[in-house]
């Protein structure tokens, strides 16, 4: 892909919605696969009372809409302003207590796990039915739209084409209940092909530092997969 085309795909613009300022992609098709669309606000005439505490709205008790769920609340039930990066808001926005809790948890993904995914890790990669794995660095692209694999060859898999993700684990010690991630089995569609393609990533057995990095990357990918499924189910 030429630098000009890549720049157009990654271009963003600042827009103002009823909920606040958002930095969104120039072209909607090039948005992050982890993103969420803004909700439709419940019309004012349909919510004469707070949808949490049932307080009646009047001149004193003002009505507020949660920017994440779109429901109506009084100030007491919708007072928190929390970052909502999945909707591309520039500043923290007003959210109800339940939504604020979810957004706080997601902030950890953007502050920690996303950085791990962008940095990448080294895996033994097997494509399809191949019996010979290839050592490759797997990372998430800067625009969050592709898994990029670099080794003797170069591959890119669009996150939008991913069908299923299975994290492969093994026990820490015999008989123990705790497990650790050692690999990932991923199925994705290929344009023009009827059957889904398969990719297996396995952490190498060489350097302990490399294994820890791979385990952290797999854990981050597990969290990313949950966000991906939520975005698709919206």
UniProtKB/Swiss-Prot annotation:
<dbReference type="InterPro" id="IPR000306">
    <property type="entry name" value="Znf_FYVE"/>
</dbReference>
<feature type="binding site">
    <location>
        <position position="96"/>
    </location>
    <ligand>
        <name>Zn(2+) 2</name>
    </ligand>
</feature>
<comment type="function">
    <text>Plays a role in cell adhesion, and thereby in cell motility which requires repeated formation and disassembly of focal adhesions. Regulates microtubule-induced PTK2/FAK1 dephosphorylation, an event important for focal adhesion disassembly, as well as integrin beta-1/ITGB1 cell surface expression.</text>
</comment>
<dbReference type="GO" id="GO:0005925">
    <property type="term" value="C:focal adhesion"/>
</dbReference>
<keyword id="KW-0968">Cytoplasmic vesicle</keyword>
<feature type="binding site">
    <location>
        <position position="99"/>
    </location>
    <ligand>
        <name>Zn(2+) 2</name>
    </ligand>
</feature>
<feature type="binding site">
    <location>
        <position position="66"/>
    </location>
    <ligand>
        <name>Zn(2+) 2</name>
    </ligand>
</feature>
<keyword id="KW-0965">Cell junction</keyword>
<dbReference type="GO" id="GO:0008270">
    <property type="term" value="F:zinc ion binding"/>
</dbReference>
<keyword id="KW-0479">Metal-binding</keyword>
<dbReference type="InterPro" id="IPR032031">
    <property type="entry name" value="ZFYVE21_C"/>
</dbReference>
<dbReference type="GO" id="GO:0005768">
    <property type="term" value="C:endosome"/>
</dbReference>
<dbReference type="Pfam" id="PF01363">
    <property type="entry name" value="FYVE"/>
</dbReference>
<feature type="zinc finger region" description="FYVE-type">
    <location>
        <begin position="44"/>
        <end position="104"/>
    </location>
</feature>
<dbReference type="InterPro" id="IPR052113">
    <property type="entry name" value="FYVE-type_Zinc_Finger"/>
</dbReference>
<feature type="binding site">
    <location>
        <position position="77"/>
    </location>
    <ligand>
        <name>Zn(2+) 1</name>
    </ligand>
</feature>
<keyword id="KW-0967">Endosome</keyword>
<feature type="binding site">
    <location>
        <position position="74"/>
    </location>
    <ligand>
        <name>Zn(2+) 1</name>
    </ligand>
</feature>
<keyword id="KW-0863">Zinc-finger</keyword>
<protein>
    <recommendedName>
        <fullName>Zinc finger FYVE domain-containing protein 21</fullName>
    </recommendedName>
</protein>
<comment type="subunit">
    <text>Interacts with PTK2/FAK1.</text>
</comment>
<feature type="region of interest" description="PH-like">
    <location>
        <begin position="107"/>
        <end position="234"/>
    </location>
</feature>
<feature type="binding site">
    <location>
        <position position="53"/>
    </location>
    <ligand>
        <name>Zn(2+) 1</name>
    </ligand>
</feature>
<dbReference type="InterPro" id="IPR013083">
    <property type="entry name" value="Znf_RING/FYVE/PHD"/>
</dbReference>
<feature type="binding site">
    <location>
        <position position="50"/>
    </location>
    <ligand>
        <name>Zn(2+) 1</name>
    </ligand>
</feature>
<dbReference type="InterPro" id="IPR038632">
    <property type="entry name" value="ZFYVE21_C_sf"/>
</dbReference>
<dbReference type="InterPro" id="IPR011011">
    <property type="entry name" value="Znf_FYVE_PHD"/>
</dbReference>
<feature type="binding site">
    <location>
        <position position="69"/>
    </location>
    <ligand>
        <name>Zn(2+) 2</name>
    </ligand>
</feature>
<keyword id="KW-0862">Zinc</keyword>
<dbReference type="InterPro" id="IPR017455">
    <property type="entry name" value="Znf_FYVE-rel"/>
</dbReference>
<dbReference type="Pfam" id="PF16696">
    <property type="entry name" value="ZFYVE21_C"/>
</dbReference>
């Amino acid at each position: 892909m030429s630098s000009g085309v890549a720049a157009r795909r990654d271009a963003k613009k600042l827009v103002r919605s009823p909920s606040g300022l958002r930095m969104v992609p120039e072209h909607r098709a090039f948005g992050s696969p982890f993103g969420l669309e803004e909700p439709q606000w419940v019309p004012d005439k349909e919510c004469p009372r707070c949808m949490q505490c049932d307080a009646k709205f009047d001149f004193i008790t003002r009505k507020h809409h949660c920017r994440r769920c779109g429901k109506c609340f009084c100030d007491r039930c919708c007072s928190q302003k929390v970052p909502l990066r999945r909707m591309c808001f520039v500043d923290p926005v007003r959210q109800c207590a339940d939504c604020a809790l979810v957004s706080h948890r997601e902030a950890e993904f953007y502050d920690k796990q996303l950085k791990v995914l962008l940095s990448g890790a080294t895996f033994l990669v097997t494509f399809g039915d191949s019996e010979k794995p290839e050592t490759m660095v797997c990372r998430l692209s800067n625009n969050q739209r592709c898994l990029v694999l670099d080794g003797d060859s170069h591959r890119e898999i669009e996150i939008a084409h991913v069908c299923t993700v299975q994290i492969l684990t093994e026990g820490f010690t015999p008989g123990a209940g705790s497990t650790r991630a050692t690999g990932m089995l991923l199925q994705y569609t290929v344009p023009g092909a009827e059957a889904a393609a398969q990719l297996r990533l396995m952490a190498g057995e060489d350097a302990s530092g490399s294994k820890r990095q791979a385990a952290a990357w797999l854990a981050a990918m597990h969290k990313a997969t949950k966000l991906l499924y939520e975005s698709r189910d919206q």
